[in-house]
Amino acid sequence: MIKSELVQRIAEHNPHLYQRDVENIVNAILEEIVSALARGDRVELRGFGAFSVKHRPARAGRNPRTGEHVPVEQKSVPFFKTGKEMRERLNRDGLDGATPPSPPAA
């Protein structure tokens, strides 16, 4: 699902809202999440999950073509941890309502 499909589905479930208003709301929510992460804050949506920033230290990398060692600078990356309710629902219902795959036999 892409953002425009999300906006369309929300608008369909809320006929009292114009699609452009739903789009503005979705954009505002996403912008607030990004702004909070940029400030170093954690964003927790109970039952859904939590967004945070992980800091990766500088390290030595390798160019796969030449094998040359290259320095890789430290960086910050977004991280999402699913909430308990979401994990339970996905494991219970599976994807698209299908039965989740069984674990491999030991």
UniProtKB/Swiss-Prot annotation:
GO terms for biological process: DNA recombination; regulation of DNA-templated transcription; regulation of translation. Residues 82-95 have a biased composition (Basic and acidic residues). Residues 57-106 are annotated as: Disordered. InterPro entries: Hist_DNA-bd, Histone-like_DNA-bd_CS, IHF-like_DNA-bd_dom_sf, IHF_beta. GO terms for cellular component: chromosome; cytosol. Pfam families: Bac_DNA_binding. Keywords: DNA recombination, DNA-binding, Transcription, Transcription regulation, Translation regulation. It comes from the Bacteria. The keyword Transcription regulation applies. One of its GO terms (molecular function) is structural constituent of chromatin. Belongs to the bacterial histone-like protein family. This protein is one of the two subunits of integration host factor, a specific DNA-binding protein that functions in genetic recombination as well as in transcriptional and translational control. Heterodimer of an alpha and a beta chain. This is Integration host factor subunit beta. It comes from Afipia carboxidovorans (strain ATCC 49405 / DSM 1227 / KCTC 32145 / OM5) (Oligotropha carboxidovorans).
